[in-house]
Structures are given as C-alpha cells and as structure tokens.
Amino acid sequence: MTKKLEHEYIAHTERPALTWDEQGQPYSTEYDDVYYSTTDALAETRFVFLDKNNLAARWPHLTHQQTFTVCETGFGAGLNFLATWQLWRSTRPSGRMHFISFEKHPLNSAQIAKALNRWPQFAALSEQLCALYPPSSAPGFHHITLDEGQVQLTLYFGDAKTGLEQLVLAHGAINKIENRSSCIGDKQQLVDAWYFDGFTPAKNPSIWQPCIFTLAAELSKSTTTFATFTSARSVRDAIENAGFKWQKVPGFGLKREMLFGTFEQHPFAQVDPNKAPTTAHRSYRKRNGVQHSWHLQTANSEHQPPKTAIVIGGGLAGAHAAHALALRGVNVTLLERAPNLANGASSNLQGLVYTRLSLSGNPLSRFNMAAQLYADRFYHSHNFYTTCGEASGVLHLATSNAIEKQLRNIGEQHASTDPNPIFNWVEQQDTEQAVGVSTSTGGLFIRNSGWLNPVQLCHALTNHPRITKLFNSDAAQLQQDAHGQWFALTNDGHKLASADITVICTARDAKHLAQTAYLPMRNIRGQVSHLSSHGLSQRLHASVCGAGYIAPAQSGIHCAGASFNLHENTLDLREEDHQFNIDNLASMSKSLTFNPPLTTLDGKVGFRATTPDYFPIVGPVPIRDEFCERFAGYRKRAATPIPQTGPYYRGLYVSVGYGSRGLAYTPLATESLCHSIFGELQPIATETLLHLHPARFLFRDLTRNRI
C-alpha cells in the first residue's frame, strides 16, 4: 500500500535563488523575474485575485459551519495570503477560511518578513505568520492555524503538480468524476476560488503546464471561480481545456490583459468515468501502479455539517477532538467514565511534546516531523505552552552513532536554510549552555518545543461553551437510528447522549465497542518517577530525552520516565521501575544522578495504547464484514483494481492508538479528522492519511490473506 508512495516525496526543498533591490524587494535570479509588481503590488493583488474572485461579496453568505477554500499555485512572499486574510478580517464572515498554497522554492521566515516589511499595514499579520511559519527546508504539507481556528493556512513546500496530485488522490477524484461520488467523510468540500499565480509563463512554464489546470478542475465545482494576472495564449488554452470558462479584461497597471472566470465542467464529464481515470491517477499509476479507493466513501449529497457530537473519552485524544469540533460550531457532549478528565495515560504531571525524528524518508519519520512541527505551532498559537506548560526547548540526545547521524543531519539541513532554525545540532561540550546541565552526548535541540501538564491541557481544551462534560458516564454501546442519529448507551441500555456524529477516543477500550472491537491495539505499561530536585538538577531549564526523559522541576519535583513493561497490568508502583528510570537519567547526565529511597518514591503508572505500525488510528470507522466482502479480491492479488468505495458507518469516527506520543500526535491527527468529518481538503499527504486510516489493517490483512 505505501512503499511505492515513498518515492513521491523529496528529502529537502529547493532553496530560492534571489537578490534584493534597493527598496527591499525580492528578485528571482533563477527565473529572472520579480516576486510581485514593482509599482503597487498590493493594489494588483486586490485587483486581480480578491476583486475578480468576488470574495467580499461571497463571504457574508457563509454560515458559521461553512469553510471557504482558496487555493493558490505560488505562495512566494505571502502577499496574496496576507491581503486575503486582511479582507477576511474586515468582512468578518461567520464561517472559516482555508487558504492552500504551493511553493517549490520556499523563502524562510526572515526573508518573508523582509519582503512584507514594505507594507506596514500588514505588520501584525506578518508577525503572526512569521512566528508560525514552518522551516523552509522541510518539504511537504504544513498546516497553520490562525485567528483561533477561523483562518487556516496549508502550505505545500514542493512542486505544485505533486501537491495538487496529493489533494486529488486523498479526496477521491476517482471514478464518477462528473458527480463527485467518492470522498473523504460524508460530503466533500472543494475549492471555492483559485489564484493562478507564479513567475511569468515564459520564464516558469512548469507552473502553467496544462496538467496544473486539469488537476485544479478535479478539485473544483460549479461555483468555483479563478483569476490570474496573465492572458498568455498557452494559459488560456490550458484553462479552457480543463473545463473553466474564462473572460479577458484589462489587466492591472501596465499589464494589458488578465483572465478570470468560473468552472463549468470537468473535461472527462462526457466520458465513461470508469474508463477515464483522472490526471492525478494516471500520473500516479504511471509511477506507482494501482491506486486503491478503499479509504473513500460514497458521497451523501443530502449530508449537512454536524450540529452535535458525542466524544467518548476525556483524555488527550478526546479533549482535542472536543476542542476542534467546538471551534467549528459543533455542540459537543464529552462522555468520561471516570469522575474527572485525563485519568489514563494522559494523567502525568509533565509530558514532553516528543516524536522520534529522522530524515530516513520512511512514512513514520515524515509523519513524526509533520506532527512535531504542527504540535508546537498549535500549542503556541493557542497559548497552551504558557498556561499548561513551558516551551523551554527539548534536547534529543544522540544515543547511538546512527541516531547521531540522523539528528546531526536534521540540524545541519535546517541551519543551511534558516538564520534562526527551530532545530539545532548541539555538540556535547555545548549542551550545558543549551539545557543547563552537561549531557553525555550531543543532541538535536528543538528551541520552540517543551513540556505540558496533560491534565491541565485537557481542562483547557474542553473549557468551551459548546462542550458539555458528563463524568461517571460509561458508554458501553453505540446505536444509530434510521435518521442517522447516534446514541451512546450504558451496559443496561440507559441513554447517555445522542448526536449527529460520534468520535471514539477511549484508547484500547475502543475494543469494548462492537463497531471497533477488531482494531489491533495493545497496552504497554509505563511508570513515571517523581524525583525531588537537588542542586545540580535545579540547573536544568529545558527538557532532555534519550534513554529516558526528564523535564525541568516544577515545585521542586522532576517528572522522569518512563518504563516499558509488556504483558503487565499492575497499577502498583514498583521499585525496579523507579530504579530503571533513575539509571537512565544517570546515563544521560552526571548532573541528573538521583538516590532517593525507592520504597517511598512517588510516581504514576499508565498504559499506552499502541498499534502494530506505531501510527495512531484516526478517521471514519469501517463496517468490518462488509469491507471484507467488498474487497475480497485483495486476498488473491494485492494489486487487484477494485474501483469501489469502502463501507463505513455514517457519522462514526475513531481517534486512538497514540502510544507515548499523544502530546505530539493528537493536534495534527485531530485536525485531519475534522477535515474528514467536514469534507474539507486535507492538511496532510495522501500517504499519511492512509497510514492513519482505521481501515488500513483490514486492507493489509486481506492482501496477506489473514482474514
């Protein structure tokens, strides 16, 4: 399913070749072209893209649950985005805006700030953007949340054609093209407005090639509009052949003409869809073979965005799900069987925002990097690092030569493109300056990451007027009526809540519900030790992870851990596990040597719900027996083309299996989940979506003839 997908991704981005003129404007030496107009770039942006897409008149009609999606083919210095964001703020519509942009040669945050410095009216917006802007050396999708979730920016660093293909592949522009019969979730939302932008067609023809517009058409609908500054004949023909109807009008300033218009029909609309695969699928198949569609659902044309939701589970996964849904205008009932939030693995005093980082190129390492970057942005943008923890940095120690090579490569790659990189390689002799104590090896320091108190975070996430918390409420059964409403019931059939959708966030206990009983998860016991700080350890001002982990002391106590105990289920604190944690700390730093009386040492025991492939399980819940019957052909041959959508429970989702990385994984995974629920274009790559998908285990077991 995924090995061939790996070749679609580049290991690093292509740096922009640019110079700056006396006015501080960037100029591309590679394309011999300006990034924006040298006369009045902002006025041109408003004239071409904002006015010709009629944004100010369209936005007031949005409902509070609608998302308006803008897609741009060249981010450049971000001027178009800031102008759109400013107009959105001044219009103050009820819904949300999702701005998607592609950039093959991304500028770094310092270059973005310098380029935008010319417009003081954007100073506040530019500062927010640059504070959350991803490392320019990291390829792929990067999702940024602004204005408390009302504005979302998804950047794709890499070739626009590849990025557009990812969106098409993930969202089901496959078969039945003319009526969009397959999608992620119950209903698909497509692009509302296109900004076709980039260096001029004569100097950068790749961004204006016909397949760009054909891919754009596959993500468009009858109300989709477009605008572009150019009227070149090759662009006109490509736009028209892709199914867009164009108008030619006088351009801005000295530019003679420009194009704008609407989408009419897909060029394959009059062709048998089963014999006419889309551009993305033809390109994919040429490189990688068969593209499966088991992750897609048959679209429900009558589906409306959910107004109510049940979230089962009050740990990190449930709190994040409730928070994200509430921000989208959903009234959430959160059911927790315990008397308070965060009772399971989410109950530690301190937890690090941690994933295992590398540039090895495998799917998990790419997800880890994306999750780490998004989690840190999320906790900063919502101020959770201030209210529930501290972004004092995390040092990842090089515990082997192989790990040192990986971590050093990350630091060097980021240092080569960013003047103030998020990731910094620190030599062993310099670690004391970085974290406060000298460590046994060098490591990778993530300056904007840190630790959080999971209990406080769960309370902060669920502190929203649209979230109702019901404790001592054990949802043992789920039932759906003929109208699609979900009911959460106790063992004896007592109704706890009803809603349009349900999200299961109960870690391994999801196996106790009939709909998710087959999910492959196991519990791994972990014990954390609470250690009294001493003279040397009090110098620690950042978190350190290696053989174990430790965070700076709070109220004189360090939280350190954690043991991994397979096939054990005791909740009792054990002296041997305390000693295990203490020994690991001593191996990391002589300053982190502790000798407490083990018999009285305090700590915490929890159980991590892990999956066989280490990815969490996030997305719509498949109907197991129907899935196996529909895709039975995979038992004979994994590459069998079965152009059918998968069978899924309408309105039932799951978010479990985060293991020990809940703080790092849940923000991005939950954002992807909500995009699925609302049919929004995904903020993650197709590869990542398939690795998170709950049906992936059924697909794999069928191809291996295990079920």
Swiss-Prot record:
An annotated GO cellular component: cytoplasm
Source organism superkingdom: Bacteria
Protein's GO biological process: methylation; tRNA wobble base modification
Catalysed reaction equations from the record: 5-aminomethyl-2-thiouridine(34) in tRNA + S-adenosyl-L-methionine = 5-methylaminomethyl-2-thiouridine(34) in tRNA + S-adenosyl-L-homocysteine + H(+)
Cofactor: FAD
Flavoprotein found in the keyword field: yes
Subcellular location per the Swiss-Prot or TrEMBL entry: Cytoplasm
Residue segments, region tRNA (mnm(5)s(2)U34)-methyltransferase: 1-264
Coiled coil residues, start to end: none
Record-stated family: In the N-terminal section; belongs to the methyltransferase superfamily. tRNA (mnm(5)s(2)U34)-methyltransferase family.
Protein name: tRNA 5-methylaminomethyl-2-thiouridine biosynthesis bifunctional protein MnmC
Origin species: Saccharophagus degradans (strain 2-40 / ATCC 43961 / DSM 17024)
Organismal lineage: Bacteria, Pseudomonadati, Pseudomonadota, Gammaproteobacteria, Cellvibrionales
Gene label: mnmC
